[in-house]
Amino acid sequence: TDTVYGIGCDLMNRKSIERLCHVKNIKPHKLNLSFICSDLSNISEYARKIDTPIFKILKKALPGPYTFILESSSKVPKILDVNKKSVGIRIPYHNIPLAIVKQLGNPLISASIKDDDIIKEYTTDPEEIYETFKHKVDIVIDGGTGGNIASSVIDCTGEKIVVVRKGLGDVEFLGLWSDIRPGKNSNI
């Protein structure tokens, strides 16, 4: 993506999601993965009603290196078979994941490819990724050397907007919005 390499699958394919969990060694009920969507209208299917101030932030930041935690729609638990109240959603500024999402017609569910190395947090070399995952996944796409800084994670589910992780995406513009309470300031 526009941040670090990720591993993902079709959000609507339960067997692929189970396989992704197996590859990442994650228990399905502890799933904390993000969805890669193609555009803002795509987000509305997977997030509950988005208030105007939050929508303005999404519109300003996306596509870009941000993951927004939003209240999940009723569609999310049915897909993932878990009772998740929130979901991380991304629209990366990168042609490869956006082309995959458009071709599938569904978002991708994804997770960053972490590295066991204590010096570097993320694997950035596509050849190294291929060697690690070639027998575990259907395809590895070489998008060139990846970045080593993850997306900024912004939680929009509480009383105030909270920066959970400061990553590649500039969060300074959120200073203007720090006192917004979702659902309370819809006139902004």
Which functions belong to the PLM regions below?
Residues 2-188:
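Active-site-adjacent structural elements in enzyme catalytic cores
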